[in-house]
Every structure is written in structure tokens, then in C-alpha cells.
Amino acid sequence: MVIYSVPARLVHAYPGRIAVRVDAADEAVARLSEADLGRVASVQIRSPTAGRELRRWGRGVPVDLVMAQPSVDYPSLYEYAELGRDHPLRVSMPTEPGFLRAVRLAVSLNIAVKLEVGQPGPAEIEEMARVVDLYLHQTTTSQPIEYFHSVLMALVHGGAPTTLWVIQEEDPALHRHVDAAA
């Protein structure tokens, strides 16, 4: 089934499963009705502002916090940690210098991580190696760190072949990104 990733203002233009992109948590609360929540695959918050508005809203709806500058924005994870009680919670971040600190904090707060990997330089490769080590050897890690989790699961279980496009939710056969102009 295809999931359309749409800005909150276009929710009603797309029937079926949707991933809703908002700039702040309060926008999701204001724009999505209870009826809409049944088709929402996730809410992606693109600003590291406090998410208190989501605590009593849409219980069970997955929340993906996009952290554009993980080396700077990582303290905002403390504000979101309590949401994990009512929502599956994940933080998505680019692999830029300093992202390891954000990954460590997310893991300690029991928040899943999705790494958005571009063409890494030597510093990013070193940090990625440290993240893999953290994921494999820190016994308190209980949430997945993607893309490592899915790649390792595919290797261990030898199931159906997969691609990084599928793992990173960028396969156009499964995920379609709709820009603000629709």
C-alpha cells in the first residue's frame, strides 16, 4: 500500500494512508480530526519545538521528529521523551558532524533513530562506526537505529531481499512525497 507524505494542509486531498508533515506539534493537533487519525501512518514534526500538545492527542499515532541539526538540536529530545508513553516515537537526523551525541541521547531516552545518510566524509564514517558499536554492544539499547537495524535483520534472517530505498522509506512504489504545491 502506498503512503503519501503530505503537508498538513493537504490531508483532505489524499484519500488512503498518509504521513502528515507539520512544522510544529500544535499544527498536527489543529489540522487533524479524530476521523483523519484512522488513516494517518505517522506525523512528521520538522521543528524541534516542544511536543506537549501531542500528549493527549491521537494516542498511538507514530511521531517522527525531524532534527535538521542534530549536533545543536539534540537537547530538544528531552521535551519529547514523555511522548513515548502514548506514541511510537522516532527521531530522524542527517549524519553530519556531531550527530553521535543526538543518537546517544535518543537511545538513552528509549527513542528510535533513523539516520538520513548522504555521502559521508571521514568524520561521519567514524561516527557511524561508533553508532553501530553502540547499537550492537550497549545492552540498554532497546529501540532500532535505522538503517543499521533493517540491514542487520535482513542479513541475520535472510528473508526477502530489501533495498536501502525501502529501509529509508524512499521507495516510490511504497512512499510518495507530495510537496507544498501538491
Question: Across the structure, where does each feature detected by a protein language model lie?
Answer:
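Radical SAM enzyme [4Fe-4S]-AdoMet core and its adjacent flexible, acidic
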Residues: 2-181
